[in-house]
Amino acid sequence: LVSGRLTNVAGSSDVLRGSIVSYSSEVKFDVLGVSPGPVVNEQVAVEMAVGARRVLGADVGLALTGVAGPADQDGVKPGTLCVGLALPDGSTTSRTFHLPGVRDQMRQLSVISALDYLRRAIAEK
């Protein structure tokens, strides 16, 4: 969803190297190098962002992991979104959001929340 939103803009190939949809836990572990365990927390979001940056050879890694419902996942409530960033200077940052709404609303709010978080982090650097 995030890369889809970014590629709606002409010229996006100048700034977007690619994206990885790690919907399954196995892809998080095997492709992105996430430590085994529950996958919806800020540490996992950071590990995903670092892994995406490494795999794609990108300056910045942005990662989202969360629960859109309808049921809890490993005790994490629907609407929970963890965003991780891996920045060019090697620093990382993360944040947890609690999003309202039903599944489709949460998915769209996830994109908005993650891109705004990225924008703010880059502006602060």
Feature map (PLM): residue ranges:
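Short alpha-helical segments enriched in small residues
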Residues: 1-125
